[in-house]
Amino acid sequence: MPFCLLDVDKDIPEREQHIYIKDSKEPKGHCKQRCNTNTIPGSMTERGCAFAGVKGVITGAIKDVLHVVHSPVGCTAYGNGTTKRYPTRPEMPDGSVFPVENFNLKHIVGTDLTESDVVFGGMNKLKKVIREASKEFPFVNAIYVYATCTTGLIGDDLDAVCKEMQAELGKDVVAFNAPGFAGPTQSKGHHVGNYTIFEKLVGTKEPPKTTDYDINLIGEYNIDGDYWVLEKYFEDMGINVLSKFTGDATHGELCWMHKAKLSLVRCQRSATYVAKLIEEKYGVPYLKVDFFGPEYCAENLRAVGKYFGKEIEAEAVIKKEMEKIQPELDFYKSKLQGKKIWISAGGPKSWHLSKPIEQYLGMDVVALSGLFEHEDGYEKMQERAKDGTIIIDDPNTLEMEEVVEKYQPEIVLGGIKEKYFFHKLGVPSVMIHSYENGPYIGFEGFVNMARDIYTAIYNPAWKLMEFEEEEPGDSNE
C-alpha cells in the first residue's frame, strides 16, 4: 500500500491514511486517501472553519450586500476579507452604478457579543445591529447574517430574526447558519452557503434581460480579477455571463440564476452543489470546467463553444491569446525547467495546476496537498501526479518541515498562513489562494503566475540569507 507515515507522525499513526505516495502500479481508485475528517488532536494544521467557508469564500465577493457577523469581535475581524482579494466594479446589471466601489472589501458589521449576551441571549442585540446597519448603509440590496461558534452554542435563532427584519426593512435579510464548528473544514461552509442561496434566493427575481447565450459562471470568485479575464473571453465568443457565483456579483444575480441556458462550474469543490440543485429543479445543465493553464483553458472554451454553436469564435480567442503569451511562456520555461515545486492549495488548485506547471514550465511537481479537499479531488491529484509524488491531506506544520527536508522543493505554492513558515525554512512561497500579482486564470493569468514563481525563486535576497539550525548561544560548547 502506498500510504506513508512520516517520521514526525510516530505519535499520531492515524495520519498514515492521509498521506499517499503515487504509485502507478496500484489499481486506479484502490487507495482511498482519508480526508474531510476532523483534524486529529495534536496535529497543528492550517485549516479554516465553516464560517470562513461561507463568508470568506461563498458570499464575500458579492458587491451590494452588507455582512453582519453575529459574534464576539474576533470572528468579525476574521471575516473582514483578510485572506482573499475580491475586487468588484460598481456597475450593476440594470445599468445603474452602486455608490461604493469595492464595498464588499471595505465594510463589515459585527454584533460584538459580550459575556452578558452569551448568558442572556443575543437576538435582541442582533435586531438592533441590523436596524442600525440598514440606516447606515441604506443603499445595500440585501443583508446577510452569519452564525458563529458562540451564537451556535447559545442557540440564537438567526432564521427567526432575519425573517422579522426582512418584513420590517423590505429587503432580503438572509441567515447563513455555518458556525465554525459545523464541519471539519471550511468545506462545510461552502455547502451551507450553496444550499442557503438556492433555497432562499434562486428563482425569486427575474433578470433585466436575457439572451440565447446566457451562462451562470459558478465557483468563480474574481480573486485578483480572475473573473474579468474570463468575461473578456466569453464576450469575444458572443456569450453573456448572466450570473456569477459569486465574484463581482450582485445579490440579484443569485436570484435569477435559474434563467441561464448553461452553468459552468469552475471551483468544483465549493460550488458544484448549487449547479446540481439548479439543474434538478430548473433543468439548467452544467459543465465542470478548468481554466488554469493554456491547455485546460483552450479545452474548456472549446466545450462551451460547442454547446452554443460558437466553435469558430472559441478557436479565434484561443489563437489570439496563445500568440500573445507564447514568447513569455518560452522564457519562463527556460528559467524554471527542472525546478522542484510543491503545490499546497486548499482544494482543486492542487490538481488544476500540477499538469500545466509540468507541461508549460517544465517544473518537477514533487508534492501536492490540500486543506479541505474531498475524496474525488484526491483521486484527481493521484491521476495527474507522477510516480513518487507525495500527496498530503490536511498537512500539519511538522509534516511540512519534513517534506521540505526530504523532497527539497525550490518553491511552494501555498496560502498566507504557510508562506512565512516556508520562508523561515529558506524556501520561497507564492500565494495561490489570493495570489501575489494576479489574475492567475486563463492564458494571461498563467503567465502572471509563472512570472511570480520566477521572481520568487530568482529573488537575490535569498543569496544574502543564512539559515542556521541553532541560534547563536544555543550551542552546548
From Swiss-Prot:
Protein origin, superkingdom: Archaea
Q: Which of the seven top EC classes does this enzyme belong to?
A: oxidoreductase
How is the cofactor bound here? Answer: Binds 1 [8Fe-7S] cluster per heterodimer.
Task: Name the UniProt key words of this record, in alphabetical order.
Answer: ATP-binding, Iron, Iron-sulfur, Metal-binding, Molybdenum, Nitrogen fixation, Nucleotide-binding, Oxidoreductase
GO BP, one example?
nitrogen fixation
The cross-references to CDD domains, in alphabetical order and at most eight, read: Nitrogenase_VFe_alpha
Protein family according to the UniProt entry = Belongs to the NifD/NifK/NifE/NifN family.
Q: What protein name does the entry list?
A: Nitrogenase molybdenum-iron protein alpha chain
What organism does this protein naturally occur in?
A: Methanococcus maripaludis (strain DSM 14266 / JCM 13030 / NBRC 101832 / S2 / LL)
